[in-house]
């Protein structure tokens, strides 16, 4: 619960502890949520690692090799939470970073507004829509930045911003000190996802999700000429074994 006239933030940092693979720490009972252990870790950009079919040898006697393409940066993120707005003056901001930009959805009773922080902010503007958020009520809010478009849902209903929610990704410049993949430390490592509150509000059931990227680095050339399958109306084609290791 936040109750202050000034805005304060909760920021996520991706602390991905290395797997205890071998040697004396293979059976270390220390939980990954141990505060002392977390304090020693450095945040990383959010990546596309999947535990399923990860290409890792669980037997610590044999040599361990990392063969999967699961360390690629993921910038398409989804942030959701249940928020109770105490008054008509309450302001809640969901923020997602991607490269040189930070994108925001500002929720207030009766209105939601989108913003782009950084390069391209003037061209994007501040598109705004009326919404059904009410003071004193509890609402489920969801904000996503996927495929160069911002998405907003309130209580399961999408708020339609039309083409105003689309944006053109900006290339980082030398001053941004970006990684070759495109992520920027100040945004994608220090604060990839955040929630800011001004006034009184209670935030519950906070969830951060990421898109899943399927990459291919070493597939045979003939895989580029697949067979054609026709799916009839009312039917679907089920694909399994979906992980970065096997894609």
Model features per residue range: what roles?
Residues 1-247:
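Soluble "head" domains of membrane/secretory-pathway proteins
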């Amino acid at each position: 619960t936040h109750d202050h006239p000034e805005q304060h933030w909760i920021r996520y940092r991706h602390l991905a502890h290395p797997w205890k693979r071998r040697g004396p720490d293979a059976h270390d009972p220390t939980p990954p949520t141990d505060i002392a252990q977390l304090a020693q870790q450095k945040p990383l950009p959010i990546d596309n690692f999947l535990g399923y079919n990860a290409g890792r040898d669980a037997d610590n006697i044999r040599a361990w090799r990392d063969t999967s393409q699961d360390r690629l940066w993921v910038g398409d993120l989804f942030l959701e939470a249940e928020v109770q707005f105490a008054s008509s003056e309450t302001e809640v901001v969901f923020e997602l970073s991607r490269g040189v930009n930070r994108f925001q959805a500002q929720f207030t009773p009766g209105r939601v507004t989108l913003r782009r922080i950084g390069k391209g902010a003037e061209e994007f503007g501040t598109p705004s829509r009326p919404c059904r958020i009410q003071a004193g009520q509890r609402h489920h809010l969801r904000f996503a930045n996927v495929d160069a478009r911002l998405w907003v849902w309130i209580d399961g209903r999408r708020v339609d911003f039309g083409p105003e929610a689309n944006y053109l990704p900006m290339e980082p410049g030398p001053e941004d000190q970006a990684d070759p993949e495109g992520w920027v430390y100040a945004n994608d490592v220090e604060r990839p996802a955040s929630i800011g509150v001004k006034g009184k509000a209670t935030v519950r059931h906070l969830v951060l999700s990421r898109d899943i990227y399927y990459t291919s680095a070493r597939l045979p050339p003939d895989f580029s000429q697949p067979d054609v399958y026709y799916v009839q109306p009312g039917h679907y084609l089920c694909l399994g074994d979906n992980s970065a290791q096997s894609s």
